[in-house]
Amino acid sequence: MVQLGLSNIMWGLAAGQLLVGPISDRRGRKKPLFWCLVLFAVTTAVAAAATEIHVFLVMRFFEGLGAAGAIVLSRSIAADRYTGRELGSFMGVMRAIQGIALVTAPMLGALIADAAGWRGIFWILFGMGVVLAFITLFVFVETLPRSRINSAQRSSNGTQRESIRESSAKLIADPVFCGIVFQQLLASGILFGHISSSPFIFRGHFDLSPELYGLTFGLLALGITAGAVISSRIDPLKALGVGAVGMLVCAVLVAVCFITNLSLWAVLPFYFLLMAFLGLTLPAAMTAALTLHRQRAGFAAAVIGSVGFVGGGLVAPLTAIGEVTRTASIIFVVCGVLLVLISFWLNRRMKLIRGDELKL
């Protein structure tokens, strides 16, 4: 039930961003954000009270849809409010907060589950959704300029579908944006490869206790946070290039440590740096995409956000094939090589075509 629930919410997170992002480019950010939070709160409450598995699984999918709206709209709102270095800094801060959440959420969840059971976690999430919905309704101010809302509504034939097709065509026709999408896909492959294989690597291969595994996982998550903080201080073009090369080098070193059966203390520094370079890359890709397509920031953020979950869905099952350290090494190195190749091409293409747009 747990695995099916996680799978359903992941599909909801991927699909919801592609649904809500384009709508927000036409209708503004406030109303979609409010209704997404309402959907999240209602479906979370139903899931918490569910007594039948099929009801729980359906609610988890729609819960993901609602949460996805909040994810993509937070990025779109940032693109409405900030430009240049400020946008890069804000994206870095967001990624750093996510890294901190990655460390603290499992521990807090375990404490709540011990005290109130898994349903208690859902009721707390329901309360958070209600509070955020009220804040959105009564405090949040629309960030998408009225002129852009009116312009979007006056599309070629006055329909939303046509506007979405036009936005899709412009994104697909942009080779730089497509390169960023593939780079995000590969970086997410490393992230989810790490998440899905880490219990088997650290608890199985290195025989760590649950407590030490939790500390190790938290330390590596802090590596992502550190990389995100650094990413907020440099331009996205440089962060994408440095991050790709760094991930490849660290992936090779981690693989060598696994192949030669070195100790945890030999592997851990390179593993930490791999996560740090990953944290450097992820917010930079989002910043670059939103900078290039500010007029359709919702759609651009939706594509970049959704492709991350696609990467996770493609890579996570692969970690169950063969010996886990070898499989993880192959995933890390292959993704690293492709990241470097795309980064070199992307770097040249950006400088030739759009260097001024991405210079912070």
Functional labels for PLM-detected ranges:
Residues T143-I180:
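Juxtamembrane intracellular "pre-TM" segments in multi-pass secondary transporters
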Residues L39, T43-V46, H54-F62, W265-F270:
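Paired small-residue
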Residues A15-I53:
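Conserved MFS/SLC helix-loop-helix module at the cytosolic interface between two early adjacent transmembrane helices
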Residues L240-L282:
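C-terminal transmembrane helical hairpin of 12-TM major facilitator-type secondary transporters
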Residues G92-F138, L144-P145:
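Helix-loop-helix hairpin linking two adjacent transmembrane segments in secondary transporters
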Residues L290-V324, F332:
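A late C-terminal transmembrane helix in Major Facilitator Superfamily
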Residues F61-I100:
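Cytoplasmic helix-loop-helix junction between adjacent transmembrane helices
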Residues G28, A49-V55, G66, C257-N261:
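Helix-breaking motifs and short loop linkers at transmembrane-helix boundaries and internal kinks
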